[in-house]
Amino acid sequence: MDQTSSTTKIVHITVTNGYDLKGFKGDTPVTFVRAEFNQTVLGDSSKVTVSPEGTAKYNFTSNIDLSPDGGGALDDLAHKPLFLTVTEVLPKEKKQKDEKTLILGQAVVDLLPLLEGEESFETTVPLHPVPGSPLETPLPGSKQCSLDVKVFVAEPLLTPAQVSASNLLKVTLEAAYSVPESFIPVGPQQNYMVGLQVPSVGEKDYTMIFKNGNLKLGGEKEPVPRPKKWPIANILAPGASNIPDEFIVGGPYEEEEGELNHPEDREFRNQAECTKKRIVWDLESRCFLHPFAVASFQKRIADCRLWPVEITRVPLVVMPKAKPGKLEKIDDENQLSFHGVAYINMVPLLYPGVKKIRGAFHVYPYLDGTVFEKTKCLFSLFRDTGHHLVQNNKAGGLNSPLSKPLSKNLKEEKPGKDKDTEGRPRLGELQAPSIKSQSSDTPLESEAPLSHNLEGQQYIEAGTYIVLEIQLEKALVPKRMPEELARRVKEMIPPRPPLTRRTGGAQKAVSDYHTQIKSISRAILNEYYRMFGKQGPKLESDIDNETMEERKCQLNYELNCSGKYFAFKEQLKHAVVKIVREKYLKTTAFESQEELQTFISELYVFLVDQMHVALNQAVPDDVPSSTSTIQTSSEQLRLFAFEAEVNEKFEIAAMYYEERLVREPQNLENWLDYGAFCLLTEDNIKAQECFRKALSLNESHVDSLLLCGVLAILLENYEQAEIFFEDATCLEPTNVIAWTLLGLFYEIQNNDIRMEMAFHEAFKQLQARTLQTKLKSTVTIENMEEGVKVEPSFGPWGVVQESTTAIKTEGLSGMRPQSSHQLSPHTNMELHPQPQGPNTALSSLDEFLEESPKAQSESQEPMATGQPLEPSLVQRSSNALLKELTSKKDISKCQDSSAFSPPTQHVIAQPPVTIFMETIRFLMKVNAVQFVHRVLAHELLCPQGGPSCEYYLVLAQTHLLKKDFAKTEEYLQQAAQMDYLNPNVWGVKGHLYFLSGNHAEAKECYERTISFVVDASEMHFIFLRLGHIYLEEKEYENAKRTYMHACKRSPSCLTWLGLGIACYRLEELTEAEDALSEANALNNCNAEVWAYLALVCLKVGRQLEAEQAYKYTIKLKLKDQALLEEIHTVQEMVGFGNPSF
């Protein structure tokens, strides 16, 4: 017994009670229960009489003996259920020797919990009636018949470590749709079969066979949800064939992982699944994977990404000696027919956290060469093994392991062995002569041509596809949990503690000073009343100065003698100290006496001014008129900083960004903008600090996470970069940019599988968003003006615009200003010349572009137009795209077939947006130019991307940043050839000529840009620079009109200054003064503004204001010597304005 217990594990199954039973011959029949497992009868219970209430107490126990190694026995528990058949024993009739029995129903017990580490479980399973059973009509008020079952083992079948390392594979075959028309339900009956192989431990593979598919005519869709069925034949009760709590639920096509999940496939699939013939299985087969089998399974996926799933049909005939109605298959006289194969991409199962693949897969004719090329599989499951492997297998489903693996890598084959280690003949020798394999150990170049599988070719003609689901209990590659990622981010970037409510602060210090001043003034006033009476102040106007001086002396004497003056000073001392510390931030000793005296003078002036403010508040009758101050907003400061960037005044730009941070340190957008500025100046360390501070303010801010990841890559902190990117995808799974950046990171790490996973998810999310956008924009497009076609487009600097190519014949005067235009401070960042940029960042990309074919862009006429391409987001890896450049021919064909539209509309075909171009826009917006060249290479090779107008625009921007004007002009020429009427092309061209000093060409480009109906991505600097050119060429009316548009759209000191200059040159001095006053209010440190204010004041004869403006002009060191000479000339003409006269 000890030896037996150590070598055999026993599963005990006890049937305790039956409920709501009734029989053929009455409501109290005599019944017994038979237990069966794996085609073996485990035993029968004793005969029990059912009570009038329908209850039977069986208390019947049966056992399943398992081998010590588990092996096939454990796998049997996974995919074979326990059958409990309840049979009624009829009373003996006269002259009857044996008892007659009739089956009432059958119950199914799923033993899968034993493989999950459980030692015991109890369940109540329904008893499904067999056809004709009285259980089909339950008693009134009773429930469905059921059995109570207890399952237990003395010790767990698997240790916790084995449970953790093992896995369970479930394969569900739903149906094959749009099958060939030659499949007809009449005539000889056919057995429709599908099979695949699963790697197991050692040298053996398991085969999964799905048999007896049900051929149906079209007419309606298969219902969902519908139950999954056991892949087992000869189940007596129809209801027992359904797997408990397992259903086929379907889902949107776009969420599938197969081949027919694109928008263009929707119509075909709807038609195929509603109106066309189909073969339905709805079977689920399981396979228990031991820890070693899990490793083998994972390795096979990595080695052979595509797995073959074969489909065929075999005729069934009625055998002469068989029982009536029993079908058997002829062994040798009929070949396989309609032998096809579907290729299942199993790679997604190696993605982190992925446990399921479900999708529709095309069926192709089975050809040895093609199958081997795609799957490295040498043998056909059906053809090379013979029909007998599936012929009489009543249990069906997962068969025993074959004697030799059916799908092996070529390098694993060992030719020359006629038998395997167990002495069994080779698989090729087992097959029937009529279906003998045409393949052999010879090279596959001699395989039969396509014409030898004409039946399989019908699958392609009919568009046949199978719907299959492959599911694992546990993911092969664990995925980090969001909680773990959030914890890791917190460890790297601790959240900023909330600011404590400070009782001090500069404003509070000044307020306390005002309070003390008011208190002391009241005390002094009370002392004055005590000495001279309350009527004194009313008669103050009648008192002469001598009397007033005498009273002041008496009051001072009294305050000093009484000690009140000293008390007032002590009362005020603490408030003054707080102002020094909080307002002036002085907490340490001064380095020199001169510095101390300077500070005391400044402090004295401030205290006196604030004393006057407090006294004026205390005496309302004497409140003077206050001068209103203009407080610039955060958006204005960002615009000013942006202007300084473009003009290469980086110190001034940094000052504006820092001012925004001082004003709103808790606003993460301010930190992101400053970080983007640091990226522009290539200060990566400070940029990282800014992005991390933004992330500390909001740990769930996706853009901050992405930018931290980008900086981590640039600084080669790859482990941190992965944490940031993964956390971003967890927080916002629909973010296309997050998935794309994660894929680019994995590409840097040479992790091809995860790279494909990330790009695949990005494609999927972009496809779903494109469909939603298309539905929302349909009505809008229909309501547009005739002759104007609007396409959603992104400008090259990341600002979303409505891009139309219809051109307006009116000039600038006919433009419709958009007063509600919101300006982004980083929408034109590529126009900022970098002071020091890497000269080799794009060299490899430039070389690659030089070798790329240019015939496509050169063949397009400037006004050529075509139909917009629908986004066909093929789910494939970027690495695979590099190997499939031949697919670019499809793009060329689409472009070559583009028709020319009527010349009155000028509609340009817009290419579909790709995940890479969307990522490029994000990176350009934040000035991450160092990372852009890698994404541009992907965009060039992407089937939905390739050379496009926006692609060449981005290239032009990157070279414009380096002041590589020759390359910039070359790429702008390419962009203009692809979209001649794109306003962004002309805008960047204008910037190119402006920066290179060719103002005549720049003027022409800017004028063309502003003549379009829809603006370019960034109009602010187009107006500024065009106005500047007009001023240079003394076209003051055009300059005035241009600057007025700029002031309406996005007012700044420079726009008002330009307007003021134009008005001054037109002798419109009042308008000039107003414009210059606006400019001065926005920035009172601009020397040019003070210079023109001085000129205006000189012209209108205001000497004091002229001198004051001239002083500030000199103090701020005006650099325009010509303007300074003009001021001197006017000063000499009018005779005033220069204090040195």
From Swiss-Prot:
Tissues and organs where the protein is expressed, per its UniProt entry: Detected in ependyma, trachea, lung, testis, and oviduct, but not in whole brain, liver, kidney, and spleen. Localizes on the epithelial cilia and sperm flagella (at protein level).
Keyword entries, A-Z: Cell projection, Cilium, Cytoplasm, Cytoskeleton, Flagellum, Repeat, TPR repeat
Ranges of biased composition (kind: Polar residues): 434-443, 816-827
Segments of skewed composition (Basic and acidic residues): 409-427
Keyword Repeat among UniProt keywords: yes
A Pfam family assignment: TPR_8
Gene3D superfamilies in alphabetical order: Tetratricopeptide repeat domain
Repeat region (TPR), residues: 634-667, 668-701, 702-735, 949-982, 983-1016, 1020-1053, 1055-1086, 1087-1120
Superkingdom of origin: Eukaryota
Region (Disordered): 392-448, 811-874
One annotated GO biological process: homeostasis of number of cells
GO cellular component assignments: axoneme; cytoplasm; manchette; motile cilium; outer dynein arm; sperm flagellum
Keyword Endoplasmic reticulum listed: no
Annotated localization: Cell projection, Cilium, Flagellum; Cytoplasm, Cytoskeleton, Flagellum basal body; Cell projection, Cilium; Cytoplasm, Cytoskeleton, Cilium axoneme
Protein function: Axoneme-binding protein that plays a role in the regulation of ciliary motility and cilium length.
Written domain comment of the UniProt record: The conserved TPR domains are dispensable for ciliary targeting. The N-terminal half is important for cilary localization and/or binding to the axoneme.
Family: Belongs to the CFAP70 family.
Protein's name according to its UniProt entry: Cilia- and flagella-associated protein 70
